Amino acid sequence: MDHIRNFSIIAHIDHGKSTLADRIIQVCGGLADREMEAQVLDSMDIERERGITIKAQTAALSYRARDGKVYNLNLIDTPGHVDFSYEVSRSLSACEGALLVVDASQGVEAQTVANCYTAIELGVEVVPVLNKIDLPAANPENAIAEIEDVIGIDASDATRCSAKTGLGVEDVLEALIAKVPPPKGDPAAPLQALIIDSWFDNYVGVVMLVRIVNGTLRPKDKIKLMATGAQYPVEHIGVFTPKSRNLESLSAGQVGFIIAGIKELTAAKVGDTVTHATKAAAEPLPGFKEVKPQVFAGLYPVEANQYDALRESLEKLKLNDASLQYEPEVSQALGFGFRCGFLGLLHMEIVQERLEREFDMDLITTAPTVVYEVVQSDGSTIMVENPAKMPEPARIAEIREPIVTVNLYMPQDYVGSVITLCEQKRGSQINMQYHGRQVQLTYEIPMAEIVLDFFDRLKSVSRGYASMDYEFKEYRSSDVVKVDMLINGDKVDALSIIVHRSQSQYRGREVAAKMREIIPRQMYDVAIQAAIGAHIIARENIKALRKNVLAKCYGGDITRKKKLLEKQKEGKKRMKQVGSVEIPQEAFLAILRVEDK
């Protein structure tokens, strides 16, 4: 076991994490040169295109060090984005060490720091590495100072490398072997294995990626998953080098995969503990928690007959993404669709993009909402994730909304505009620190303000230099109201929005004005109203199209004209009683665009 090193790589987006992983695999001969391709470990097209890692992957490599010994290196590639922070913490808890990759030309950024703190809390040894030193703009001294200043670990002997050219990659591996401790664990103890990730394979069912903490596992053993208590016979075990290779046994300290004929991905939860069915471990490994969706949105097919296809596509996505939740939902305006729960905005975009791309769906998405905790006047508490399900104002005692702690990092030139943005979003400042030219701001902001467009606006006010990460803090009482849109006195459920009272009039007016432009003129007047409960806060009128009934009157008495006008008015009144207004699909999309401003 002294020759095993389990490590992962922590980095902000675009600091070269996947490229460094590619180089390490190449140096260790994990893949022949002809099989090498960019971003070997990012298997989804969308991961490659956006340059992000979504699912954790592993590679078991062997490396002959300069001291002549052969070491087994297990690289666990982690997602870097804040939406997947739980998966990151599981990947990190399976390691003893982490390479902290920092772009020498850009210094420390938000997600680096967030994941690095997670690593330090889990007791993982952090090894700093400066990447991209071949760039003309590289400033290693500055980057080292930032690492020491912001994260507070000693980086004076940080290894310098360039993952693109392969320069210094062996030095990185040597530093890794020297600084990272070998795994602890007892191969003879009862089996405890941590599920780092799991995915669905069409041929063998669920594949679980595990780190064996104690004990030994062999094929044909019967295993038990401790969160659910379900039992399965093991069919295959092995390691990825990044290609899969079957083995006869996996023992303490190793990272590998288990295939046990599990049909449902929800059975193999990330962070759960695997043990033997007969000789079970006394207790599971710490840190397991159920992942709860934070952001909800309705997904509706543009064509009503695509509903079944959408359901099948969601089922298939769910096979590979246990954190996606969905349930059927009916809207009078948009027909049949699904209410889906996501971990965060990036997760939502990825699911939408995969539905559109891999399954060829045309979708309408309603505005993203968060989950509110509503205390009703009879004392019961309900969780509301859909504006249409919000009780009437008279039955509500108090509404609590989720608050998140946001950490922002930016060059000091942009502090002013970022603070202004946070204040507009009802944020309250907790902390502000200067690290050289970088500034770290900590704010508490309602989650609802973040899901709309916070990230895009942050990037635009800081010209792309600011980076952020957020984590859920608590539910806090807040004065939020539900704004309904009425057309000729009828509520349109899909257009309801939940906003803070201070913004309700402005938002109501804006949506009404937008709808006035979009709904075509009818043969009678159409009133568009925004209301909170029974209280109307905004109104727009669409004037009727009318025929000129006086065209045939030349001169003559005024009473004749009056009679014709009265008759027309009567007719319009009758039409208004029976007519219903068709709301075009664009109206819904327009509402979403109002929210993007």
From Swiss-Prot:
UniProt-listed PROSITE patterns: G_TR_1 (PS00301), G_TR_2 (PS51722)
Residues spanning the signal sequence: none
Catalytic activity: GTP + H2O = GDP + phosphate + H(+)
Source species: Burkholderia multivorans (strain ATCC 17616 / 249)
Keyword flag Membrane: yes
Pfam family, one: GTP_EFTU_D2
Molecular function GO terms recorded: GTP binding; GTPase activity; guanosine tetraphosphate binding; ribosome binding; translation elongation factor activity
Descriptive protein name: Elongation factor 4
Positions annotated to bind GTP: D14, H15, G16, K17, S18, T19, N131, K132, I133, D134
GO biological process: positive regulation of translation
EC number(s) given by UniProt: 3.6.5.n1
UniProt domain tr-type G: residue ranges: 2-184
Domain of life: Bacteria
One GO term describing the cellular component: plasma membrane
Enzyme's top EC category: hydrolase
HAMAP family, per the entry: LepA (MF_00071)
InterPro entries on file: EF-4, EFG_III/V, EFG_V-like, EFTu-like_2, G_TR_CS, LepA_C_sf, LepA_CTD, LepA_IV
Family the UniProt entry places it in: Belongs to the TRAFAC class translation factor GTPase superfamily. Classic translation factor GTPase family. LepA subfamily.
Main location: membrane
Membrane topology recorded in Swiss-Prot or TrEMBL: Peripheral membrane protein
The entry's keywords: Cell inner membrane, Cell membrane, GTP-binding, Hydrolase, Membrane, Nucleotide-binding, Protein biosynthesis
